[in-house]
């Protein structure tokens, strides 16, 4: 009898607790389940987005990456550009869109459409990787800045190119940036500065035969 009384007392306590806390507990459970369901939905959505963007980028790579001797045809160039624009339009927050924009810029340069190449490269720099746990892709941004500097120089905008180059910390790209700075100085008829920049490129580890030819050319002008 004592045990039964204890059980009945326990049941009464549970009833009283439920009456006081049950609704709040149900609310908490609903919120947790809804949050988990939303997270699962978001994860599935992200997976689908990445998969679709990846498929488009694979198409870009299949056309843009050659053996180094085969030139990309005119039709394939336009397809690369179209795919890049689709990635930027539909999947702008993905790295696939940023890398595809780099390939699009490459095609524009080959087509001598430098203004369009500039726009593609600026888009990369204006749309860095974002998100709470995301870190910028420094290698991609440094490459985009370097190529943008070259495009600006090719368009006759030496001052703008120099300003861009001087605003960047080149890190492991120091040799390439120093060489570009030398090219800019040559365009500005600043021979002494150009020689110093080319020397800095060599000291940073560049063994480019083309760089040596530039150095020799400056020596002939002295």
Spans of features found by a protein language model:
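Short solvent-exposed coil/turn linkers within tandem alpha-helical repeat scaffolds
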Residues: 87-97, 127-141, 155, 167-176, ...
């Amino acid at each position: 009898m004592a045990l039964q009384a204890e059980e009945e007392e326990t049941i009464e306590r549970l009833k009283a607790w439920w009456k006081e806390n049950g609704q709040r507990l149900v609310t908490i459970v609903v919120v947790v389940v809804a949050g988990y369901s939303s997270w699962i939905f978001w994860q599935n959505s992200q997976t689908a987005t990445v998969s679709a963007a990846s498929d488009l980028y694979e198409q870009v790579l299949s056309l843009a990456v050659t053996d180094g001797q085969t030139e990309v045809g005119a039709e394939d160039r336009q397809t690369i550009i179209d795919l890049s624009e689709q990635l930027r339009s539909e999947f702008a927050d993905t790295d696939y869109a940023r890398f595809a924009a780099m390939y699009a810029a490459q095609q524009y340069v080959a087509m001598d459409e430098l203004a369009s190449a500039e726009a593609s490269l600026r888009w990369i720099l204006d749309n860095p990787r974002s998100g709470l746990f995301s870190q910028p892709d420094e290698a991609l941004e440094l490459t985009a800045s370097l190529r943008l500097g070259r495009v600006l120089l090719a368009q006759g905008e030496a001052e703008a190119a120099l300003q861009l180059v001087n605003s960047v910390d080149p890190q492991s790209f120091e040799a390439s940036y120093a060489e570009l700075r030398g090219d800019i100085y040559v365009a500005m008829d600043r021979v002494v500065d150009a020689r110093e920049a080319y020397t800095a490129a060599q000291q940073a580890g560049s063994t480019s035969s083309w760089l040596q030819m530039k150095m020799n050319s400056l020596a002939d002008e002295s």
